[in-house]
Amino acid sequence: DFFFGVGSLVFGVLALTFSFGGGDTLEAEVSAFTLAWRRGDQAATDSALGALAGAAVEPMAMEAQPEAATGYLFCRARTRLFAPIFWFVALGPVGAVGYRLSVLARAFGETHDNAGPDYCQAASRWLGWLDFVPDRLMALALALAGHFSAAWQAWEQTRSEPANRRLSETGIGALGLPVDEGPRDLTIATLDDAHALLRRALYLWIALVAIGSLFGLG
């Protein structure tokens, strides 16, 4: 029993680590973008912005990049932290690994032309289903950790928007900023604030998921 318990623990840790994805941490990605933006390095900020987006992005003016980076950060945190933890609690290591494989399957479709549109649509739709509950719990945690009324208003106003935009606008709303109805001229300080908000929300979110597991989710 002892060795089985140790083996299960090791497997769980490895599965959770895998589900968080490889490469740099979110903190490192934010730091890379911030440093590049402050020294005015267009090529480096484009690369760092793509890392936060998890995919190649269209070139944009440096003045617009902090707002884009802030939106990408919320979605990146969902994919690399919040959703894997949720599925680990809900279904154990299999759930966390399954979620990560679903993320990789979608990425494969986005980067390989021979995957075909049907594959890409199916992979995106499947991942959207897996993100449905984590998105809502994460939005709640962001609202509780930040400006609740502004976050709630953003969530309601973007009801008909794609899931990623809805989540990012809710996160920006939790910072006390309005829904994007025009240029907001967000600064690099907003990205730092978003990163701090995510840390607070993560602690709250883990507590929410743990409470949910007591009622049959885990």
What is each model feature region?
Residues 1-218:
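Hydrophobic N-terminal alpha-helices or hydrophobic patches in metabolic proteins across all domains
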